[in-house]
Design a protein with these regions (language model features):
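Helix-to-loop junction immediately C-terminal to a conserved catalytic motif
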Residues: 52
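Short coil-to-helix segment of the ABC ATPase nucleotide-binding domain corresponding to the Q-loop/switch region
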Residues: 89-98
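Conserved H-loop
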Residues: 185-191
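Conserved signature/switch motifs of ABC ATPase nucleotide-binding domains
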Residues: 130-133, 151
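Conserved ABC ATPase "signature" region
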Residues: 108-127, 179
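The feature captures the beta-strand-to-loop junction immediately N-terminal to the Walker
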Residues: 37-39
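Conserved ABC transporter NBD signature motif
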Residues: 60-71
Length: 264
């Protein structure tokens, strides 16, 4: 489906004369994985929060599946960098809470089967009755991912979900996420600062620019470029740097980020 998510001329301004970004427009197709990259302050998280219904734009519109986004919805699952688990509930109970919200008519046995299926998808069945305080950082993020998938959202929104994890744990969960996305054909919008992570996971990469003074005039930030990822979709981390075109793609994105950093 073309244009499952549509962003039209989105802008956000905390000060009227200096919008953080302006005139941001893009589409995401159903089943597509799109990453957004840019320096801090360019508005990446603001855009994600607008898509999640947690913030409003100063102008412009965001549509998903033909309907304008006007507030939070269980049609969109969100995973933040911080795990956002309820500390007094177990893994099972944290996910069951979300499942009950989506399907209030379900009975406990049906909820448990559904929860266990999604906990198993992220390899945490042995820890299903533990509380967050008993889990490592990587395990908590796995729970967050399982919870997001468990409500079967039309779209998954990820705000640097692996940013606080060590490299080994991050790589393992990236692999798990890729497997689940392929299995479910999930539509994903993800913020990352990691160029290799974006190349590994995404079908397209959105490059954001920051607002800046140019010849004494303020120019808002915005969507500077949309980069198509030409690498085969069934790629793995180990294969990544062997693919023709990998270094050209990586260098292009790094050059963009370096040039924008110098502009500041």
């Amino acid at each position: 489906m073309t244009g499952f998510l549509k962003i039209e001329q989105l802008a956000k301004a905390y000060h009227q004369d200096k919008p953080v970004f302006a005139d941001v427009s893009f589409t995401i197709d159903k089943g597509e994985f799109v990453c957004i990259i840019g320096h801090s302050g360019c508005g990446k998280t603001t855009i994600l929060n607008v898509l999640a219904g947690l913030d409003t734009a100063s102008s412009g519109h965001a549509f998903m599946d033909g309907r304008e986004i006007s507030g939070p919805s269980l049609e969109r699952g969100v995973v933040f960098q911080s795990h956002a688990l309820m500390p007094w509930l177990t893994v099972r109970q944290n996910i069951a809470f979300a499942v009950k919200s989506k399907w209030p008519e379900w009975k406990t046995p049906q909820i448990n089967v559904h929860v266990e299926k999604h906990v198993d998808m992220v390899g945490l069945l042995p820890a299903i009755d533990k509380k967050p305080s008993q889990l490592s950082g990587g395990m908590k993020q796995r729970v967050g991912i399982a919870r997001a998938f468990a409500i079967q959202p039309k779209m998954l929104l990820l705000d640097e979900p692996f940013g606080a994890l060590d490299a080994l744990t991050r790589g393992t969960i990236q692999d798990e996420l890729m497997g689940i996305v392929r299995q479910t054909q999930q539509t994903v919008f993800m913020i990352t600062h990691d160029v290799d992570e974006a190349i590994l996971l995404s079908d397209r990469i959105l490059l954001m620019s920051n607002g800046n003074e140019v010849n004494g005039r303020y120019v808002p930030g915005g969507l500077a470029e949309v980069v198509q990822n030409p690498l085969p979709r069934d790629r793995t981390r180990a294969q990544l740097h062997h693919f023709p075109g990998y270094y050209d793609l990586r260098n292009h994105i790094v050059d963009f980020l370096v040039s924008r950093a110098k502009a500041h």
